[in-house]
Amino acid sequence: FADSSGQLHAYNKSNGVFYRTKVENVCSKRDLYEVQYSDIEADSDDKYYARNLIETKLSESESQISVSYSRLLQCCKDAALEGDAFRRGRQAVCKLASNLIVRHPATMLADRNRAREGSSMLLEDVVLTEEEKALLDWSGWNGDHKALAELSAVATMFFSEDGSIPVNRIRETFLEKHFSILEAPIGSGFVTTSMSMFIIGSEDDSYDFDFAYMPLSSKYAALFTSDSSLEPFYRLDLPHIELMNCLHLLNCEHWDVALSRENGPLEHAIRDWAKTASN
């Protein structure tokens, strides 16, 4: 979404301010995936267990996704919607979508808290070998069962290959859906948000859904639907891209910042969203 200078236009929902910023400054929150020790001094420099471990592994995963993701965008540009590059790109988008869902703070908080609260019960019957104790001591756990349980929960949420883990079930659900590409018209572009998708038709006790929408770049967006009759590619006109941008803001429950490559589409989307939401 950024321009050639690495910047984009943004709108902060909480204060209603439009601004221009660099990509790395958008939606940045320090220590989002860090696990804090249970007993620490307020001014301690060593607050976190296995600091940067999760962030490093996430960066490695994102680097792998980005290669296929970039090739997918090139396939869209070339109208090459078949073949291995497009298939791998679609898989990368599904993996990214599932990761974004489970990594959102609103999703993580309950699981992390449950892990801490249940740490004593989970570990009371565990007998560690001397090698395991040595490994934990090397990791710097400091005998903190709550921190260990929370780190384990976060690592499982993000990186486990178990098919029953939510991130993998969500990815499989996306992969099963019919996939369509939307192209923005010249002179306009897609708007995205800090939670860069919306989903319709999902139930609390099910991983299935009817419809999901995810902007991929300022030029392209993806649809995931249960309707296999839809075409694989749609070139939108101006009214329809303005509609999709507004629908994104209206239907995405957890967004704090809206973003676009150019200022015009963003301002128009915010204006439409504010007007519709107030009715």
For each feature predicted by the language model, list its residue ranges.
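Alpha-helical structural context detector biased toward long hydrophobic helices
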Residues: A2-N279
